[in-house]
Amino acid sequence: MIAPATLAEFAAAVRSAPRVLAVGAGTKPRLSAVEAVKISTRDLRGIVEYEPSEFTFTALAGTPLAEIGAALAEHGQYLPFDPLLVAAGGTLGGAVATGLAGPGRFRFGGVRDFILGVRFVDGLGRLLRLGGKVVKNAAGFDVPKFLVGSLGRFGAIGEVTFKVFPRPEATLTLELPFDPATLTRFARSRYEPDALDVPPGGQTLLVRLAGPGRAIEACAAEIGGRIVDGAVWDRIRETPWRFATAITPAEMPHYAAAHVSGAGSVAWSMEPPPCGLTLRGPEPLWLGDRPRHAIEDAVKLALDPHGRFPGLDD
C-alpha cells in the first residue's frame, strides 16, 4: 500500500500503477474489495481552509470526520447529513466516495447536497480542481456530485470543499408507538422533524426534533410520546448491523429482521427469512442489478479512458 503525504505525491502514486484505488480508514472494506494497488489517504489529512462566516470548509480526503466535526462545533456549525461511522474513524474522502449519509438526510439531503468542490486525480494522473469554494458558485457542470457515491471509479479524491449549517440550539428525541393513530397525529403536526427512524421490530418510531428550545418542547408536547436519550442517533450512525450467532435452519425465521430508515430514505429487509440470507461472499454485495446510464459511461470515459480505476462491474 502506498501512503503519499502531499497531493503531488498522491498524483504520482496514481500514475505509478496501471490499476489503483484510493482507500481511507478502511471502515467500509466490502466496498473496496477489488484487485488493485491501494493508495492510502491516511497521511493526507488536515483542514486546509475554514471560513465560519462563509459556512464552508476545505479539507484533505484523509481527514477524520471526528476531527472535522470538532472543528465545526467550536464555531457552532455542523454537517447536517450526519456522516456515518465517525467514531469508527471514517474519513471525509470515504464519506464522499461512498455517498452514505445518516439520519439527517431525511430533512437536509445527503452528501451530494453539501459538496461544493473537489481536487482529485483522474485516470491520466492529472490533479484536477472542479467546483468551487463558495456556496453561490454555479458555473459549469457540477462534476463534484459525480464523485459522490462513485466508490473511486472516476478518480482518486484528494481534497474536498463542503458547505455547513449552523448547529441548532437544542435537539430532542421522541419514541412513539408505530401505529396508524400515532402516525396520523404526527403527520398533522405543524412541526417538521429533523430525522425519523423505525428500529428493528417495527413497533416504535424515533423522531428527532431540532431548533429553538421552547419550540421543540412545544412540538414534543403536541406530538406526545416518550423522550429518550439522543445518543440513539449516534448508534444508528455507526451502523451496528452485524451480529454472529450459531443457529439451526429451524430457528432462522426467529432472527429475520428489517430496519426501515426514513433518515436514509432506504429500507433494508430480509423476507421471507430463509431466502434473503447470505452466509458467505468473497465479492462486494449489491442489491439488484446496477443500472447503466450513458452519461455515467461518458464521464468515466472522459476521466478514466484507460480504466485505471476499478468499475462497479469489476
Tell where the protein language model's regions lie, with residue ranges.
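Conserved active-site and cofactor/substrate-binding residues in soluble primary-metabolism enzymes
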Residues: 5-9, 63, 67, 87, ...
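FAD-binding subdomain of flavoenzyme oxidoreductases
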Residues: 88-194, 201, 205
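Short beta-edge/loop segments at beta->alpha junctions of small alpha/beta modules
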Residues: 24-30
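Short amphipathic alpha-helix segments
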Residues: 176-196, 217-222, 244-260, 271-274
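N-terminal glycine-rich flavin-associated loop
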Residues: 1-22, 41-88, 100-133, 169-176
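Conserved glycine-rich FAD pyrophosphate-binding loop
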Residues: 32-34, 42, 202, 225-314
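Terminal amphipathic helices with adjacent charged low-complexity linkers/tails
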Residues: 208-226
